[in-house]
Design a protein with these regions (language model features):
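Intrinsically disordered, low-complexity terminal regions
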Residues: 1-266
Length: 266
């Protein structure tokens, strides 16, 4: 009899856990039908944001509230017919709240959107297989993109920026961390900049890139697989490298105040 009671209790506990998970999954869930070049804006405060391209025809957003004080944070939706606009809002009655929101966004693969901005104050931002005007930023966390195309701008105050298999133009910066960017195809003639105040910068460009290139580091080494001339700075400590690749149709700047700078072929 006791064994049967324990079994029933176990089943009840399992069902309760399942219902709790279902409830968590329903913190926020909505689908939006916007057109190409419309805006997707996610403003988070604490928590990660993930954006993924998929084989669908609508923008889908799911948000999970996490933490002991999760009831004191909510998702504010001010979206319009041509704009997905979501923001994390915290109760003014509660300070030092142990609560965060994790956003998971899916967008139709191959459709260009204006991701401006996608941001979080404390958390990581990750994206794959997305296209458009991409503006990602976090104050404390990493920014990671893979297979993105368009105009990409990724920044963090404290964390790493890693961009793989990008197509288009890229600007990336961090105050404390490393910048790694791989660009497999350059489109247009947009200028590009890669910088780290305290960290390393490593960029890969197509071997046939057209660019007016400048590399610099105040405390570190320079390395390049392109025909650039590396020289010591005449007036300050550090090293510089300059050169024109092809027609020099765009400016490309790589810099670090304290770290190594490398420009390689993708």
């Amino acid at each position: 009899m006791r064994k049967n009671i324990l079994r029933v209790a176990g089943v009840v506990s399992l069902l309760a856990s399942m219902f709790a998970l279902d409830a968590a999954a329903q913190d926020f869930q909505k689908t939006y039908r916007i057109r190409a070049n419309d805006t997707v804006s996610i403003r988070n405060v604490s928590g990660d944001v993930k954006v993924t391209g998929y084989d669908g025809d609508a923008v889908s957003v799911v948000a999970y509230k996490e933490g002991r004080d999760r009831e004191f944070v909510r998702v504010e939706d001010t979206s319009t017919a041509n704009r997905v606009e979501l923001r994390a809002r915290y109760s003014e009655e509660r300070r030092n709240t142990d609560a965060s929101i994790r956003f998971e966004v899916r967008v139709p693969r191959g459709v260009a959107y204006n991701f401006n901005p996608v941001s979080t104050a404390s958390g990581n931002i990750e994206a794959s297989d997305i296209t458009g005007n991409i503006r990602f930023s976090t104050a404390s966390g990493n920014v990671t993109l893979k297979g993105a195309s368009g105009s990409i701008n990724a920044t963090t105050a404290s964390g790493n920026v890693r961009i793989e298999e990008a197509r288009g133009s890229v600007n990336a910066s961090t105050a404390s961390g490393n910048v790694e960017a791989e660009i497999t195809r350059l489109d247009g003639a947009t200028n590009m900049s890669f910088s780290a105040a305290s960290g390393n910068v490593r960029v890969r460009l197509p071997s046939d890139a057209d660019a007016d290139v400048e590399m610099s580091t105040s405390s570190g080494t320079l390395e390049t697989e392109f025909p650039l001339e590396i020289e010591d700075s005449q007036y300050t400590s550090g090293k510089r490298a300059r050169g024109r690749l092809g027609n020099g149709s765009r400016r490309v700047r790589l810099s670090s105040a304290s770290g190594d700078v490398r420009l390689l072929k993708s």
